[in-house]
A protein has these predicted regions:
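Extended, polar/acidic
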Residues: 1-131
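Proline/glycine-anchored alpha-helix kink/cap motifs
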Residues: 105-111, 130-142, 165-180, 202
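Beta-strand segments within the central parallel beta-sheet cores of soluble alpha/beta enzyme folds
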Residues: 141-148, 175-184, 211-215
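Glycine-rich and small/hydrophobic secondary-structure elements
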Residues: 2-29, 154-206
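Helix-loop-helix module between adjacent transmembrane segments
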Residues: 114-116, 151-157
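Short beta-strand elements
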Residues: 104-109, 197-206, 210-216
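Short, solvent-exposed amphipathic alpha-helical segments in soluble enzyme
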Residues: 36-38, 132-138, 195-196
Length: 216
């Protein structure tokens, strides 16, 4: 299935999802997953922001490596820059949210009524509903998303990660499907807080009035 919501033929990182196994027990599914064989062509990699922005850099996505180029600030090109310049650079690492509860989703499809029900500890109940409906080509009125009690999130459960795959599996098999990640899988295969490199330039006069502050 060449559908990036589920899988993608262009693997970009360790933890990228390439296949799924549905079985009667977690043990059978794990054993079957070990037997999957992949043929992967190694592509040029990019590991830093600076390398990704270089001319001729390997393109991780078809539409380029840059997500957006927002512009904001005051002073600088909008006013006369005066006084001493102060430059502050900072860097943060990639951070996992480490919610007490790992990611989990359950889906059940009723072929008689063409109704899908998805249970998950999500922060985006209506996002799950619209995503599953669009993916399966079902009316939104036929999809019900139920938010279960959440064992922590801190933002990591805003995205639809397991819910679409569980729903597809349930519709394919007409049986309930449960997907649950352990701690290692949650760190490798779900969303993390992005590492950030920032630079702030400020110009101040002797009277400590700030005249320019372009950020990036």
């Amino acid at each position: 299935v060449d559908q990036e919501t589920l899988f993608n033929r262009h693997v970009r990182f360790v933890g990228d999802r390439v296949a799924a196994v549905l079985a009667d027990t977690p043990e059978i599914a794990a054993a079957a997953a070990e037997k999957i064989k992949l043929e992967i062509e190694e592509l040029p990699a990019v590991f830093t922001v600076e390398d990704a922005m270089k001319e001729g850099a390997p393109q991780l996505h078809e539409d380029g490596n840059t997500v957006t180029l927002p512009e904001c600030g005051f002073g600088g090109r909008y006013a006369d820059v005066q006084g001493e310049e102060f430059i502050h650079r900072s860097q943060t690492q990639r951070v996992s949210h480490i919610a007490m509860e790992t990611h989990c989703a359950v889906a059940d499809y009723n072929p008689g009524t063409d109704r899908m029900t998805v249970w998950s500890p999500t922060q985006s109940t209506f996002g799950v509903r619209s995503c599953v409906a669009a993916l399966l080509g079902m009316p939104m009125s036929h999809v019900r998303a139920i938010k279960t009690p959440m064992g922590g999130s801190f933002g990591c459960k805003q995205e639809m990660i397991l819910e679409p795959l569980a729903a597809v599996g349930a519709k394919m098999t007409c049986r309930p499907v449960k997907l649950q990640l352990d701690r290692r899988e949650t760190i490798l295969c779900t969303v993390l807080r992005h590492p950030i490199k920032s630079e702030i330039r400020a110009n101040s006069t002797k009277a400590y009035s700030q005249s320019a502050r372009p950020d990036r």
